[in-house]
């Protein structure tokens, strides 16, 4: 006979590795890891895929299911998000609005914003409550703004706005008949003095920005900055504190015309009390303290700040040469660069989709999956996608992992993933023909393949039973008996067989080379370990040892072993030959000696205590129970070893009697919970960047408990 069939001392046997298993009915099957995405149904082995997110294409390959009407697309390098290149871009793995760096629109932590200089500002409209763009005005200056536009506040008593060829013109308000006139040369005082021997016209002049009083040098003079009538010595006129008087008779007749007056022998000047005044005997223009007109030794002028200037005796708005405001023949204008534009209606923003303007506010027209909120632009996501401050995140469960930003499927041998897809690793006992996996059968051996399936060539005393489930059977006489599935000589003593008082039980791989034992982890994940358990029952007391090893490539990359430890649990099920569902850790068939011993001898004893059995969770792949939740247990300390980088310090094993809701027999199970502790400078066993060859090994850990007996 050749591999994989062997002939042992008792029967024909089929050798398998960890990818195949034999059930209690002796049927060959594929060994599957619960929760790894592979399921076995009536049609054969298949991948259990979520139909909403995963699908099989026409070639039978597994791919991500994408909505054809959505923004996602498939490329040769993976899944991509289709973007409008004119408005959206991806920068450093983040989706954002594409902005022209030369334009006034910018982005910040709160969203899109406008870059403004000191002449513009953003303010909240007290009526609508919306933020609006406006011109920045000095609150202490005369320039104001309302719903009609920018305005210049003036003193209505001294200033007025006249209509000019290109719009309004600021001018000094002159009272009709007030003694002041204006012409292209400026403001002047008009006065007619007509005494019998004196006549004067236009005594006021305005030259080079200075108001002066032109006097007749023969009749008027200025003494100590005071205007006075020039009296000729011996001319018949005298002057004293009371005024001018004629010193000769008869008194001449003196008359005066406005703005000059003559009363009781005194000549006076009638002035408007709102625009002129006499101070210290001098005629002056009356200036309002905040009226915008100032007086100096050079004369009367307009007071201006940095926003106004006087050029060629003309008041102009002072604009920044590097700013957007300019002045010309048509008045003040605002220069704008794209996307801003200036028209008769005001400053407008040129925009195109997806930008919109609603109720005088700039907005962004968006479509699903984007939405706008108080915090800015966000992306609506559906499971398994979610959005956070760090970006869009893909949530994935068991069977997936993310390496270097790429979603990958986790596989366990014999399935591996390469750049070409999934690959099934198989031993020479298998072959692939026409893309189908089959057994590699030696035609000269006792196993043959026909159109009906796999067949075994047999000779007496072997035969195949009839019925709905045919099986290979052995014909034997009454001199033999079958005990625990093994052929044995019938008891010739006539008294019948009895359960041995001493028996041994062992399961697993004593060489610790087969990583096929299922271990449950605290974080709802699972791992594969190699383990060997040996039990010895004598007089109702069971003594056992358990040894476990594994390496990082068999574990999910979740958590921090340096701070939390390497924690896992396995379950030993002595009654698994009668109750396969109780075999939570998926041990291969156990060996019991002697052949007549019952496996019940090795189950924990439920008698003699009350409520000491811990009930495990009913989830097939998640039955880890923390130490604090165990009803009662025994704790054993041990010293593990392993890779130097891990710096393993100590280990603990808790042993507890347990039951699983999925088991069908009454016998208890043995719950073994492990905790491996590291020094603080050790390497995290779960670090995705750590070597997958990091490993640990426990010593054979002894434990004892009371066995099942009555």
Curated annotation (Swiss-Prot):
Pfam families in alphabetical order: Adeno_shaft, AdHead_fibreRBD, Av_adeno_fibre
Keyword Cell cycle: no
Keyword Cell membrane in record: no
Originating organism: Fowl adenovirus A serotype 1 (strain CELO / Phelps)
Protein name: Fiber protein 1
Note: All late proteins expressed from the major late promoter are produced by alternative splicing and alternative polyadenylation of the same gene giving rise to non-overlapping ORFs. A leader sequence is present in the N-terminus of all these mRNAs and is recognized by the viral shutoff protein to provide expression although conventional translation via ribosome scanning from the cap has been shut off in the host cell.
Subunit record text: Homotrimer. Interacts (via N-terminal tail region) with pentons.
Source lineage: Viruses, Varidnaviria, Bamfordvirae, Preplasmiviricota, Tectiliviricetes
Domain notes: The tail region anchors the fiber to penton base capsomers, whereas the shaft, built from several repeated motifs, allows the knob to protrude from the virion.
């Amino acid at each position: 006979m050749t591999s994989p069939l062997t002939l042992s001392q008792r029967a024909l046997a089929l050798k398998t590795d960890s990818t195949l298993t034999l059930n209690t009915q002796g049927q060959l099957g594929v060994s599957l890891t619960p929760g790894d995405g592979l399921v076995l149904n009536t049609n054969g082995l298949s991948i259990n895929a979520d139909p909403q997110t995963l699908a099989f294409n026409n070639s039978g390959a597994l791919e991500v299911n994408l909505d054809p009407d959505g923004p996602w697309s498939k490329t040769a390098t993976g899944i991509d998000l289709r973007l409008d290149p004119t408005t959206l871009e991806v920068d450093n793995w983040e989706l954002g609005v594409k902005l022209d760096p030369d334009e006034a629109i910018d982005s910040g932590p709160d969203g899109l914003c406008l870059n403004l200089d000191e002449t513009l500002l953003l303010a909240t409209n007290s009526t609508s409550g919306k933020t609006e763009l406006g011109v920045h005005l000095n609150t202490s200056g005369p320039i104001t703004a309302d719903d009609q536009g920018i305005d210049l506040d003036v003193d209505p008593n001294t200033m007025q706005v006249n209509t000019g060829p290109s719009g309004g013109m600021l001018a000094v308000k002159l009272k009709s008949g007030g003694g002041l006139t204006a012409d292209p040369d400026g403001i002047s005082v008009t006065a007619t003095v007509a005494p019998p021997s004196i006549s004067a016209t236009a005594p006021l002049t305005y030259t080079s920005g200075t108001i002066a009083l032109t006097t007749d040098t023969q009749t008027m003079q200025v003494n100590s900055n005071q205007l006075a009538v020039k009296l000729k010595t011996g001319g018949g006129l005298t002057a004293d504190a009371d005024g001018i008087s004629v010193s000769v008779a008869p008194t001449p007749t003196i008359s005066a015309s406005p703005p000059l007056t003559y009363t009781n022998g005194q000549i006076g000047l009638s002035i408007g009390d709102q625009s002129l005044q006499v101070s210290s005997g001098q005629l002056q223009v009356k200036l309002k303290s905040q009226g915008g007109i100032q007086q100096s030794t050079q004369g009367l002028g307009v007071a201006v700040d940095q926003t106004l200037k006087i050029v060629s005796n003309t008041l102009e708005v002072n604009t920044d040469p590097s700013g957007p405001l300019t002045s010309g023949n048509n008045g003040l204008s605002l220069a704008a660069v794209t996307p801003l534009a200036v028209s008769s209606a005001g400053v407008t923003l040129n925009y195109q989709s997806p930008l919109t303007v609603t109720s005088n506010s700039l907005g962004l027209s968006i479509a699903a999956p984007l939405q706008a909120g108080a915090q800015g632009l966000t992306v609506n996501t559906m499971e398994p996608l979610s959005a956070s401050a760090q970006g869009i995140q893909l949530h994935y469960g068991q069977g997936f992992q993310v390496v270097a930003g790429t979603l990958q499927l986790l596989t366990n041998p014999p399935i591996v993933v390469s750049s070409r897809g999934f690959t099934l690793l198989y031993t020479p006992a298998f072959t692939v023909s026409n893309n189908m996996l089959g057994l590699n059968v030696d035609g000269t051996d006792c196993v043959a393949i026909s159109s009906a399936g796999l067949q075994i060539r047999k000779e007496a005393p072997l035969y195949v039973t009839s019925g709905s489930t045919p099986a290979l059977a052995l014909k034997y006489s009454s001199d033999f008996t079958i005990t625990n599935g093994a052929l044995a000589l019938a008891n010739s003593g006539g008294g019948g067989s009895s359960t041995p008082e001493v028996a041994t039980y062992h399961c697993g791989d004593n060489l610790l080379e087969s990583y096929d034992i299922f271990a449950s982890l605290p974080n709802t994940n699972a791992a594969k370990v190699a383990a060997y358990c040996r039990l010895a029952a004598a007089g109702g007391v069971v003594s056992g040892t358990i040894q476990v090893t594994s390496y990082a490539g068999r574990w999910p990359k979740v958590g921090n072993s340096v701070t939390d430890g390497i924690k896992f649990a396995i379950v030993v099920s002595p009654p698994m030959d009668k109750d396969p569902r109780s075999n939570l850790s998926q041990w291969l068939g156990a060996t019991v000696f002697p052949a007549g011993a019952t496996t019940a001898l090795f189950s924990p004893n439920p008698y003699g205590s009350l409520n000491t059995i811990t009930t495990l969770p009913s989830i097939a792949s998640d039955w880890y129970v923390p130490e604090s939740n165990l009803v009662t247990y025994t704790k054993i300390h041990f010293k593990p070893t392993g890779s130097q980088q891990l710096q393993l310090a100590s280990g603990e094993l808790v042993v507890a009697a347990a039951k699983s809701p999925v088991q069908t027999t009454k016998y208890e199970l043995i719950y073994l919970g492990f905790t491996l502790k590291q020094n603080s400078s050790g390497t995290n066993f779960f670090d995705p960047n750590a070597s997958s060859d990091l490993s640990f090994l426990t010593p054979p850990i002894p434990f004892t408990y009371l066995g099942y007996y009555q």
